[in-house]
């Protein structure tokens, strides 16, 4: 019990990260591959012949399936013993956990403590290599397509699965050394569907967490699971209520728990999503009815109806458990036939095989399997687990998370096995993305201040990874709109640990900018840049890197409209030495709740590098984010200077726009020096759709700073105060902001932002 309590104490904070959209499903079950009726577990074989053997059948139902915990609570109260369990989808998750020896109280604590929304997210962003993190800002929707044979390839599922499977692995950690499900404290079966043949697949052995993942792999929501040469999805499609599976496992008597929802109304069927959902419900109900028809008077059927909980409402899991309890109590008379005396029930509980804590085994070998495009040497260099160490599941889990965060795998499983006498192998099995290693991304962004200044862009990004054994990758991006831009980079690690790298870059952009004198827009000027750079750098960790480089650039700036007098128009050649540092530990790109993101840069433009001007610039931009309860606070510090070297107007610092001197128009303030300090507060106001992870935030920012030595010659001294009020939506189509900004001197603006406002390439 102490070991179990310790285990659950470790599990609880991680369990907060499971899946909000975990399914969008209605779970059913399958049609073939049934185990022989003789496949009885060792524990079942020892069951007293004085009573019938009881099989518990837990049907699918997504979030509604958490009601099974309430059923189990009543079974324990009434002292009804369970000799085997068969489950589908959510029923397999609850059933597997109970089969490993967890009590109903422990199950309730675990399931209600899970943060389902976070668990459906990708691996922790903090572990993503820094050179890949910029994609999160440019393409915030999180959708990624592959490119194979000249065609777009969509991912196998919309929801990442690594954290889900890893959660299951930790829930049933005690079963890691139990490959035969008959040897669990309560023999167990999980039902899945063979996606190719449509047959039912019954898991009676293997890795329990994989069986759970396969049983709840809702098509399209989650990628199929490849196991034993089969491509598997949710068991709901063929056997949502696996009564026959329980009978073939052990059951003389079946307690079948069916999770149901009220019939759909005409209004709910008005959309294509409603129609698709109802079509699935009809198919699931048909295979359920076939199983219900096999129940006899000796069996007990418990039907749990949840009026206001959908299959995807994981935030309502705590509400489902009392409903399950009520349904079980309504069947108390039928259940009472199988109730044991207090002494007999205590004896049954005591006789259950207890899962011993996994032994502390030394690691003799480390093996990585499942690799096709990626390099085993590079992968092994990322692992903290080493031969000679004592196996540490937490360290192995961190290794797996780190590998998945790199972006090449959908999931990485891990575990230790004794393949030969006295030889313990720590095996990592990586599932490479079937749609990789070439990727394509799209994005659309739009911003306006409703005063005629509108920025927009359509972005396309192509990336090819693992060009060579050290992990070289090529990436090119193009944007049409304002500005028009193109950038291409070849990122080449120099060692298997990928600590050092070289990165040649070519880029070009063209943009129209307003030239202001005070508050008056005099007209527009056109700036075109074409350049190339070569960086050498060191990756400090996933959170940071330093780069030293050299660049050459041609700039052509000329008036476009209005009465624009530029101080030095025309074409200019630039050449510079560059030093840059970047740090990024935020948990989310555009709506972070924790972490720090900062960049610092220094450029020295020299005639001997081909520059027709000599000057220097230094800049810093950093934001720290902290969450207290539901309140998110962000502190931002920005600043830059030309160190008195008189930088030309096209390389001076620009400010103005939302959260960047809110109240001023976009890039209204241009000068050779600036600083800005701001404090931003936001709070989630509404959860729009937990499955998609969308929410509405309200917030406020307070800003202080100024731009000095301005291009327009206006005087600037002291500091300017300002701020903004905003509503923001974190949606699958990207961030959406509606805001009102005001700054000292009566400057105000109304803003609408759709998508990412981050520029495609910034040197």
Language-model region placement:
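Bacterial N-terminal signal peptides that target proteins for export
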Residues: 2-19
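Hydrophobic helical h-region of N-terminal Sec-dependent signal peptides
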Residues: 19-31
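Envelope-exposed proteins and targeting segments
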Residues: 52-54, 78, 184-188, 208, ...
């Amino acid at each position: 019990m102490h070991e179990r309590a310790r285990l659950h104490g470790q599990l609880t904070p991680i369990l907060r990260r499971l899946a909000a959209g975990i399914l969008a499903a209605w779970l059913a079950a399958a049609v073939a591959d049934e185990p022989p009726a003789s496949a009885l577990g060792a524990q079942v074989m020892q069951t007293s012949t004085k009573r019938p053997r009881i099989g518990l059948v837990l049907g699918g139902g997504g979030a509604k399936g958490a009601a099974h915990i309430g059923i189990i609570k009543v079974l324990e109260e009434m002292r009804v013993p369970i000799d085997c369990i068969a489950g589908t989808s959510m029923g397999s998750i609850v059933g597997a956990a109970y089969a490993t020896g967890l009590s109903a109280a422990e199950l309730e604590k675990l399931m209600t403590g899970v943060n389902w929304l976070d668990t459906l997210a990708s691996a922790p962003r903090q572990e993503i290599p820094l050179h890949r993190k910029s994609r999160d800002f440019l393409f915030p929707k999180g959708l990624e397509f592959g490119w194979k044979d000249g065609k777009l390839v969509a991912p196998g599922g919309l929801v990442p699965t690594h954290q889900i499977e890893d959660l299951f692995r930790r829930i049933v950690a005690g079963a890691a050394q139990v490959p035969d499900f008959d040897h669990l404290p309560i023999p167990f079966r999980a039902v899945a569907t063979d996606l190719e043949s449509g047959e039912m697949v019954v898991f009676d052995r293997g890795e329990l967490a994989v069986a759970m993942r396969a049983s709840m792999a809702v098509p399209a929501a989650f990628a199929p699971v490849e196991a034993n040469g089969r491509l598997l999805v949710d068991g709901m499609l063929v056997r949502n209520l696996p009564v026959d599976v329980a009978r073939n496992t052990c059951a003389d008597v079946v307690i079948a728990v069916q999770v149901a929802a009220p019939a759909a109304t005409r209004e709910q069927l008005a959309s294509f999503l409603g129609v698709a959902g109802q079509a699935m419900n009809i198919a699931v109900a048909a295979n359920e009815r076939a199983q219900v028809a096999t129940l006899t008077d000796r069996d007990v059927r418990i039907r749990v109806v949840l009026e206001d909980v959908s299959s995807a409402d994981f935030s309502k899991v705590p509400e489902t458990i009392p409903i399950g309890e009520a349904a079980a109590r309504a069947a108390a008379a039928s259940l009472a036939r199988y109730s044991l005396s207090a002494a007999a029930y205590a004896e049954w509980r005591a006789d259950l095989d207890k899962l011993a804590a996994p032994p502390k085994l030394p690691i003799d070998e480390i093996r990585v399997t499942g690799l096709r495009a990626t390099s085993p040497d590079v992968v092994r260099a990322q692992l903290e687990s080493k031969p000679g160490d004592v196996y540490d599941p937490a360290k192995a889990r961190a290794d797996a998370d780190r590998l998945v965060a790199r972006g090449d795998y959908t999931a990485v499983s891990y575990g230790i096995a004794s393949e030969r006498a006295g030889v313990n192998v720590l095996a990592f099995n990586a599932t490479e993305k079937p749609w990789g290693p070439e990727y394509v991304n799209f994005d659309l962004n739009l911003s306006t201040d409703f005063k005629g200044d509108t920025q927009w862009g359509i972005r396309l990004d192509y990336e090819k990874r693992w060009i060579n054994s050290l992990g070289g990758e090529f990436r090119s991006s193009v944007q049409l709109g304002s500005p028009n831009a193109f950038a291409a980079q070849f990122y080449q690690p120099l060692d298997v640990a990928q600590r050092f790298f070289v990165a040649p870059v070519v880029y070009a952009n063209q943009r129209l900018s307003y030239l202001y004198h005070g508050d008056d827009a005099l007209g527009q000027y056109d700036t075109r840049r074409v350049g190339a750079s070569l960086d050498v750098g060191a990756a400090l960790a996933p959170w940071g890197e330093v780069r030293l480089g050299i660049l050459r650039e041609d700039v052509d700036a000329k008036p476009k409209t209005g009465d624009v007098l530029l101080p030095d128009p025309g074409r200019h050649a630039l050449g510079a030495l560059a030093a840059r540092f970047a740090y990024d530990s935020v948990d989310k790109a555009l709506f972070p709740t924790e972490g720090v993101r900062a960049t610092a840069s220094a450029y020295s433009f020299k005639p001997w590098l081909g520059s027709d001007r000599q000057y220097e610039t230094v800049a810093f931009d950093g934001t720290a984010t902290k969450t207290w309860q539901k309140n998110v606070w962000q502190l931002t510090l920005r600043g830059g200077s030309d160190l008195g070297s008189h930088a030309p107007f096209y390389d001076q610092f620009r400010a103005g726009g939302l959260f960047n001197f809110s109240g001023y128009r976009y890039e209204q303030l241009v000068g050779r020096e600036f600083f800005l300090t701001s404090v931003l507060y936001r709070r989630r106001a509404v959860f729009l759709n937990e499955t998609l992870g969308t929410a509405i935030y309200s917030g406020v920012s307070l800003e202080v700073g100024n731009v000095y030595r301005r291009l327009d010659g206006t005087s600037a001294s002291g500091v300017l105060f300002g701020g903004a009020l905003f509503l923001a939506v974190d949606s699958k189509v990207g961030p959406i902001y509606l805001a009102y900004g005001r700054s000292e001197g009566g400057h105000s603006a109304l803003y609408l932002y759709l998508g990412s406002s981050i520029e495609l390439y910034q040197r």
